[in-house]
């Protein structure tokens, strides 16, 4: 019985520390930084704990986006699917701003996946305007389907 109790305590402590390692939205994080945080997490998906990169990405998803793609278990399945799986453990990425205002920003993201194939995405973030802990935080509202660009040399 003591062993089971110790194992449960260790599991609880490790999951608490693991989740504490993830960044959370705050109003000082700029639009491009939000995308960089998400992409870096996905690039190193299991570096902190299993699927930590996906959970990091989820933390910066707009509540409206979460309603469409969630709960988190569904979001994980979506990102591991053929449609978006190239984001997981990708080799590199570039982020280029296409346009912005004080309420939204649109970016072109190009990812080189682990099979050395390039994919292009349109990625949009918006500043959250409702009261609460997310007020004035930039959050992802939309990521397009990938457009394959071909392989690298």
Per-segment meaning from a language model:
Residues 30-46, 60:
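Short, aromatic-enriched amphipathic alpha-helices that serve as compact interaction elements
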Residues 2-10:
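Sec-dependent signal peptide recognition
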Residues 48-102:
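Short solvent-exposed beta->alpha transition segments
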Residues 27-32, 105:
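Charged, low-complexity intrinsically disordered segments
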Residues 97-153:
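Exposed beta-sheet edge and beta->alpha loop/turn motif
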Residues 18-25:
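Boundary at the C-terminal end of the N-terminal hydrophobic targeting segment
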Residues 10-18:
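Hydrophobic h-region of N-terminal signal peptides that target proteins for export
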């Amino acid at each position: 019985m003591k062993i089971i109790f110790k194992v449960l305590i260790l599991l609880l402590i490790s999951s608490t520390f693991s989740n504490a390692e993830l960044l959370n939205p705050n109003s000082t994080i700029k639009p491009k930084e939000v995308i960089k945080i998400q992409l870096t997490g996905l690039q190193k998906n299991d570096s902190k704990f299993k699927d930590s990169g996906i959970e990091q990405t989820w933390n910066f998803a707009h509540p409206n986006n979460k309603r469409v793609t969630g709960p988190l278990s569904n979001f994980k399945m979506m990102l591991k699917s053929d449609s978006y799986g190239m984001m997981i453990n990708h080799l590199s990425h570039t982020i280029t701003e296409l346009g912005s205002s004080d309420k939204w920003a649109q970016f072109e993201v190009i990812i080189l996946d682990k099979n050395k194939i390039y994919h292009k995405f349109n990625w949009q973030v918006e500043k959250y305007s409702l009261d609460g802990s997310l007020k004035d935080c930039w959050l992802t509202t939309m990521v397009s389907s990938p457009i394959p660009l071909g392989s690298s040399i």
